[in-house]
Amino acid sequence: MAESVHSLFDRTAETYDRARRRLIPCFDELYRAAIEALPFEREDEIEVLDLGAGTGLLSAFVAFSYPRARITMVDAAEHMLEQARERFALGGDRFRFEIADYGEGRIAGRYDAILSALSLNHLPDEKKRMIFGQSFSALNPGGVFVNADRVLAETPELERRLHDSWLRRARELGVGESDLRQALERMELDAAATVGDQIEWLRVAGFREVGLRYRNLIFAVYSGMK
């Protein structure tokens, strides 16, 4: 049986964060764009859900930008989420952790923001649409959904060119061949979709002010408001 996405991420949990900045040449801009999509004041007490939280990288950006935010991190890769627990060990009950496959269940609770980074691309399109609908239902009025993710280009030729550019840039930044090989192995299990399709699915789910916030090579940030 082919190895699952969750087990692949568990197997690379220890080195995942270290390689991230080289595997994502636009790392800072990508995560900054996700945070800038949040329409809140710094001192607001917001409830945030991080889907596919992994080691807690995106949640760390949220926690720094919103020091009174309460953040729930969900991931099916237990070892990855253990890294997140260690990252936020001094945070008390401000941070919650749930080992679960969010693509197989329902989103429980009410939130002001539901975010994800480099996770939804692992789900087939019908499950992406399901998550968009569940997210809309789980958000408070005025809440926001934000996804920073790997996306598919609009044509096969453009996809090939962007993928080649990403590979070249990652190598220029010094990514280790082992880390790159593991990333390519994970990407073989991806089900990335175009930005246009995902924006349309958000609209169908009921979101307003839907749009692209950032795009660079094979990465993008898009969002929608309830």
Where are these regions (language model features)?
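N-terminal, positively charged/glycine-rich alpha-helical extensions of SAM-dependent methyltransferases
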Residues: 1-15, 166
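Class I SAM-dependent methyltransferase Rossmann-like catalytic core
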Residues: 10-28
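A short glycine-rich, Lys/Arg-flanked "PGG" loop and its adjoining helix->strand segment in the class I
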Residues: 129-141
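Core SAM-dependent methyltransferase catalytic element
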Residues: 208-226
